[in-house]
Amino acid sequence: YYTPKYETKDTDILAAFRMTPQPGVPPEEAGAAVAAESSTGTWTTVWTDGLTSLDRYKGRCYDIEPVAGEDNQYIAYVAYPLDLFEEGSVTNMFTSIVGNVFGFKALRALGLEDLRIPPAYSKTFIGPPHGIQVERDKLNKYGRPLLGCTIKPKLGLSAKNYGRAVYECLRGGLDSTKDDENVNSQPFMRWRDRFVSVAEALFKAQAETGEIKGHYLNATAGTCEEMMKRAAFARESGVPITMHDYLTGGFTANTSLAFYCRDNGLLLHIHRAMHAVIDRQRNHGIHFRVLAKALRMSGGDHVHAGTVVGKLEGERDVTLGFVDLLRDDYIEKDRSRGIYFTQDWVSMPGVFPVASGGIHVWHMPALTEIFGDDSVSQFGGGTLGHPGGNAPGAVANRVALEACVQARNEGRDLAR
């Protein structure tokens, strides 16, 4: 499984693993173990090996390089033949590549840093239900970032008071409001009551402002059937956007919802709740750039991507690296931004990155400069925490955004 002379094919899925072998385990042995366990290998030779062509189907560790400044840590590059994976299934891809190998005894730690998804595989996926340009057309909003707000407190409001907060924020000038990730259907506010109150608030704000408004109605539920029922009710109520927690809900459920949203004209907002459990440790886990690629394949029109400047962790260059992986068609390899492979998405639509978490109007120049127009700035406490109330908070955000966009268009340096 360690084959340093192997020449990768255009159809191979390539993986870059950050590998920390146990003391005494050579990196070549550890890299071979990763390739074997994540493809055709098992702990012994079996008789049925002779009934297939292992040479055709096995993963190959084709390169190993030491990590600069780290003791006994390496980047292992592994190539997987395309035939190992079911078409259009992120679930199967992850089950194969990361399903068992992270518990391997020969490794002290293992991190999946990046994946190269070949066009031959990415073309089998639905991708975002609509994408950046179609969303702008649906909402009739161009030339600036979109502006949103997560309704707070995230838990405890009644449906009526929740709808009131939505109305005040939309009436004040926001493009959309949002359910928090853990707002599903709790005793204090059942989902149907919330959906009805939000729809009423949204239509009232639209009538008074003359702008198209949105709210991300969280359809995440305990079963796929219940999730689809909630998404259908969101469509019937006339709210243009639904929402899913894609890591806690699962990739199979997410892809099913993405198909429904595409077929029924709903935009799909994605929250990454639980991501830090998977991606926060540098040496062990799955980097968010991999989860971002997986989301683009599974389907979502926008996804939370960190802020660089807010309360949640995120390095600027690395964050902008996976923002480009979400939005752009073709992304060149750039190790300084953590991009290990050139990625060609061909014609797959892009995904809006959402900046959210501890941001307020003071951050608006930096957010506008860092993320550009094709992004969503999501202010929760930065709207609802305004001393004058919810509507003045929304007004402040809208005025700040329009001032920053005008200054940028006039050639001002927003970074200063």
From Swiss-Prot:
Enzyme Commission designation: 4.1.1.39
Location of the protein in the cell: Plastid, Chloroplast
Cofactor note: Binds 1 Mg(2+) ion per subunit.
InterPro entries: RuBisCO, RuBisCO_lsu_C, RuBisCO_lsu_C_sf, RuBisCO_lsu_fd_N, RuBisCO_lsu_N_sf
Uppermost EC category: lyase
Annotated positions for site Transition state stabilizer: K311
Entry PTM: The disulfide bond which can form in the large chain dimeric partners within the hexadecamer appears to be associated with oxidative stress and protein turnover.
Keywords: Calvin cycle, Carbon dioxide fixation, Chloroplast, Disulfide bond, Lyase, Magnesium, Metal-binding, Monooxygenase, Oxidoreductase, Photorespiration, Photosynthesis, Plastid
Misc: The basic functional RuBisCO is composed of a large chain homodimer in a 'head-to-tail' conformation. In form I RuBisCO this homodimer is arranged in a barrel-like tetramer with the small subunits forming a tetrameric 'cap' on each end of the 'barrel'.
Family in the record: Belongs to the RuBisCO large chain family. Type I subfamily.
Name of the protein in question: Ribulose bisphosphate carboxylase large chain
Organism: Cheiropleuria bicuspis
Lineage of the species this protein comes from: Eukaryota, Viridiplantae, Streptophyta, Embryophyta, Tracheophyta
